[in-house]
Regions:
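Extracellular, repeat-based ectodomains that mediate carbohydrate processing or recognition
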Residues: 1-196
Length: 196
């Protein structure tokens, strides 16, 4: 949207997976804008079969053209941005089944190594699985996630919440108790609702 003219540009196709026969909403993108006005598009991959991609607009505040910045294994991208710190990226990898990870970047091009956030298995379970929703409020990152019993997506249960005020260096519960990541225990201190 151009605030000066009051005009809305026509949509722009950044990446069309349909040309490869992909018609899967798992591949939907997430959009972020940085402090300089560049538009960033994080296109989800699917499992380990299709890699995710990051694109950046060639010019600030302009959807005319994009460049691909990187391609790697990731799904369900959730990208946060701080003008002071840069990008913080929550995402899923299928190293096992739907495990949660995060990484950060000051410029969107050079990223820290990804770190695992959660992979909960209980008792005799051999696989984990999670879905999450995340947000940023001021300098606080927060994510809430469930767990899938033995990795079965149809057994979504319980709610866990962790937060960080130092850009993912340390994590705590909502009441400030330290949380060790990756969260691997069913009864971890960040469990807020137990539905099992």
């Amino acid at each position: 949207y151009d605030h000066a003219t009051g005009m809305l540009q026509k949509p722009r196709v950044v990446m069309d997976k349909g040309v490869d026969g992909v018609k899967d909403p798992h591949d939907d993108p997430t959009i972020q804008i940085d402090k300089d006005g560049y538009l960033w598009v994080f296109v989800s991959g699917r499992s380990n079969s299709r890699k995710g991609r990051i694109y950046r607009s060639i010019n600030p505040f302009d959807i005319t053209a994009f460049e691909m910045v990187s391609e790697f294994t990731m799904a369900y991208p959730q990208i946060m941005y701080s003008p002071e710190r840069g990008f913080f990226f929550f995402f899923t990898r299928y190293d096992g089944t739907r495990q949660l990870f995060y990484q950060s970047s000051t410029d969107g091009r050079n990223w820290t190594s990804y770190k695992q956030l959660a992979s909960i298995k209980n008792g005799t379970e051999t696989r984990s699985g999670h879905y999450q929703i995340s947000n940023i409020c001021g300098n606080k990152l927060c994510t809430a996630f469930n767990r899938h019993l033995n990795g079965n997506v149809d057994t979504r249960t319980s709610v866990y919440v962790v937060q960080s005020t130092d850009w993912g260096q340390t994590w705590t519960t909502v009441d400030g108790q330290p949380v060790t990541v990756p969260v691997t225990k069913r009864d971890a201190n960040c469990l807020v609702v137990d539905y099992e």
